[in-house]
């Protein structure tokens, strides 16, 4: 029996179980399947199956293309006790010739199935593009321009109207905010008295439609979290970190399964580093509680850590780093896999990381938003 002879409902059920990366091939294989895949009902069913599987895709930007990647935590151990940790490209997600538009992509933000890409285009100006990898569509953000080097961007979701918004915090005017509504294509500039600064070179992360940053009091230099609530269009109160920290010991914020926020803390004692990872029990714009996820003692110094991934079910964290080879002739890219009860492995990535991982890789959950 040919696939075309099967009942429509059965075909839909089979196709709705395909992985995200197979959408492009499915649409190009058969006109009927292409039409089916563009129905909202099919998209909702397909996305529901992807979400129910519990698997989370990682999106990586390489050479101005968007890839779906997978990480093999176990790898193959060689004679030198070094694991070959494979970072496998599952394939390119079709997104209307991004590589022909951008010269370089500086950052990527993910919120509710959409990606916000920030980079330089062919005339060297800085532009923003919003993409939905599920539909393979992109749209220019036309009314946000004239970026300064240290302006802060955030990507969020207004639950009251069901639309995505972009926030810009101006570096030159620290009390000035700009909010762009993607649905109405409207732009609003307002003043908001800020008594704190967003941590230098730290990007915010989107969780449940809101964005969280490290912030530091301008007088006391105390460090804490701050949240921008995109529904109420305002910053929330200061949220305490698990314990008092100095910001240079804090690693990047990380979102776990689109449900929790993780904080990494590094300390150095006697030539060795101690790493604590805390995960939220509860996280809202005006409330947070923490529990310790993992403590790692006596690990090498992670001076140049480029990013990390948390696998909460396996109780494992993967740290990405650079190491200079003997004689400082070249730099190799490696990863440390650490877990409970002293579990520690060094993994050889063999090929260079394409960009700093913490900036150009994010967890991705698809959305049917067009």
From Swiss-Prot:
PANTHER family: BNACNNG10540D PROTEIN, F-BOX DOMAIN-CONTAINING PROTEIN. NCBIfam families: F_box_assoc_1. This is F-box protein At3g20690. It comes from the Eukaryota. The lineage of its organism: Eukaryota, Viridiplantae, Streptophyta, Embryophyta, Tracheophyta. InterPro entries: F-box-assoc_dom_typ1 (IPR006527), F-box-assoc_interact_dom (IPR017451), F-box-like_dom_sf (IPR036047), F-box_dom (IPR001810), SCF_F-box_component (IPR050796). Residues 1-45 form the F-box domain.
């Amino acid at each position: 029996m040919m696939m075309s002879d099967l009942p429509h409902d059965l075909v839909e059920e089979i196709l709705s179980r395909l992985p995200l990366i197979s959408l492009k091939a499915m649409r190009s294989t058969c006109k009927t399947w292409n039409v089916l895949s563009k129905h909202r009902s099919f998209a909702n069913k397909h996305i529901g199956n992807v979400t129910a599987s519990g698997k989370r895709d990682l999106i990586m930007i390489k050479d101005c293309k968007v890839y779906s990647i997978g990480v093999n935590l176990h790898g193959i151990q060689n004679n030198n006790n070094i694991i070959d940790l494979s970072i496998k490209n599952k394939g390119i997600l079709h997104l209307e010739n991004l590589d022909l538009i951008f010269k370089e992509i500086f950052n990527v933000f993910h919120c509710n199935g959409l990606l916000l890409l920030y980079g330089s285009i062919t005339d060297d100006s800085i532009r923003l593009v919003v993409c939905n990898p599920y539909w393979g569509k992109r749209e220019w953000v036309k009314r946000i321009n004239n970026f300064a080097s240290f302006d802060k961007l955030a990507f969020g979701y207004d639950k009251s109207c069901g639309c995505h918004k972009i926030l810009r915090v101006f570096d030159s005017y620290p009390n000035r905010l700009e909010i762009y509504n993607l649905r109405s294509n409207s732009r609003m500039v307002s003043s908001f008295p800020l008594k704190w600064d967003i941590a230098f070179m730290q990007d915010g992360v989107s969780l449940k439609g809101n964005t969280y940053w490290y912030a530091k009091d301008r007088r006391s230099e105390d460090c804490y979290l701050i949240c921008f609530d995109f529904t109420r269009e305002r910053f929330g109160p200061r949220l305490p970190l698990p314990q008092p920290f100095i910001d240079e010991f804090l690693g990047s914020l990380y979102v776990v399964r689109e449900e929790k926020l993780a904080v990494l803390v590094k300390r150095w004692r006697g030539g060795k580093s101690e790493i604590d990872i805390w995960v939220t029990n509860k996280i809202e714009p005006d409330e947070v509680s923490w529990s310790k996820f993992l403590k790692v003692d006596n690990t090498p110094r992670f001076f140049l850590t480029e990013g990390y991934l948390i696998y909460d079910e396996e109780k494992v964290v993967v740290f990405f780093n650079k190491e200079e080879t003997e004689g400082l002739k070249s730099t190799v890219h490696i990863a440390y896999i650490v877990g409970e009860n002293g579990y520690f492995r060094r993994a050889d990535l063999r090929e260079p990381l394409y960009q700093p991982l913490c900036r150009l890789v994010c967890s991705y959950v698809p959305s049917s938003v067009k």
